[in-house]
Amino acid sequence: MGESIAQQRGPFARRLQEYAASIELTLSEQQVNQLLDYLELFEKWNKAYNLSAIRDAEGMFTKHLLDSLSIAPHLTGERFIDVGTGGGLPGIPMAICFPQRHFTLLDSAGKKVRFLFQVKQALGLSNVDTQNRRVETFQPQPQFDGVISRAFASITYMLTWCNHLIHDDGRFWAMKGVMPNSELSELPKKYIVKASHALHVPNLEGERCLIELALAQESNSKA
């Protein structure tokens, strides 16, 4: 069995700071500690709650934590919802990095939301709200500036199921592997791609990208 997160905190802390600097993200010592505390909680609860198939410390650090941090330079807005958040990825890391912004973490699996509530309490994340419900039943007031998802099977499904969550000037951010050209070719006409960002994560094989979408300007309503 490999080393735990706790046994590798020193090297992981250094790598976190190096990666943050490479994407022009400033992290305090407290934020680095919170990120690693979160990863330790994830590791502990994963054994019983099956939050992720990734079990080794290096895999969780790279494929979960660094991958989540990679989107930090691209988010704009103040209020976000992470849909299908699972174990809190990327919502918890983003909430730690941006304490002045608010993040709602939504998942239909009760055990995962119980874990997220424990993380919120343990780390003192006052800018996090958890929701245990299906996305189509959640009616936020006010609506969000942005929807973030790492989990939806397709971008069209994301837009369809999350359409009601954001205001007309809001954004959808879809985290993907290789550029999903076939998905983008099937976008509903009232949506446009505002930008696509290549994401660079050290020691992570394969391509990663972030697709930013919005309601087309000529669409006056999302109805």
Curated annotation (Swiss-Prot):
SUPFAM superfamilies, per database record: S-adenosyl-L-methionine-dependent methyltransferases
The signal peptide here is none
**For binding S-adenosyl-L-methionine, which residues are annotated in this chain's numbering?**
G84, L89, V135, E136, R150
A Gene Ontology cellular-component term: cytosol
Against CDD domains, the record matches this protein to: AdoMet_MTases (cd02440)
Catalytic activity, reaction form = guanosine(527) in 16S rRNA + S-adenosyl-L-methionine = N(7)-methylguanosine(527) in 16S rRNA + S-adenosyl-L-homocysteine
Q: What enzyme category does the UniProt record give?
A: transferase
Q: Which UniProt keywords apply?
A: Cytoplasm, Methyltransferase, rRNA processing, S-adenosyl-L-methionine, Transferase
Task: Give the similarity note.
Answer: Belongs to the methyltransferase superfamily. RNA methyltransferase RsmG family.
Q: What does this protein do?
A: Specifically methylates the N7 position of guanine in position 527 of 16S rRNA.
Name of the protein this chain belongs to: Ribosomal RNA small subunit methyltransferase G
Q: Which organism is it from?
A: Saccharophagus degradans (strain 2-40 / ATCC 43961 / DSM 17024)
